[in-house]
């Protein structure tokens, strides 16, 4: 993915993610910043795990890329992007919209809806973590985080940022052009560094 212009496949996947996230909002889903915390950090470097679950159980989380993946992980099959729909999203939409037979009003649906909650409440993939706006009260519900170990995730992310910094000019400068692409990439590295939760 070290290119000035992304391949169509990557752009299509990115657009699908943004569209699905926004459609989630139109269906009533709020940001679920606690979703990505349910994944063990090591699982985010596992090809079989990321193939099945991607980076988060909810597209309503801001887990846009697998920044803990290390050189060689992608070649082994580790997925770097969010799911089309996560298991939490499917569950939440089912809970909110599924028709429950033999009920004629919302009060009669309560028993079934409560049972569905009880069934999943011990599974961390179905945890909801509201977006925190003014201060971080719950460290498991942060934006732009991955996995259940923020210290190790931050250290892996910093390792990747160091690789980028060592190659910034090589990957972003076109001979004969200005350094604006290099400057833009540098600003993105600084921005990513500011998002690390350690």
Q: Where are the model-predicted features located?
A:
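Active-site and adjacent substrate-binding regions of carbohydrate-active enzymes
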Residues: 11, 29-30, 38-39
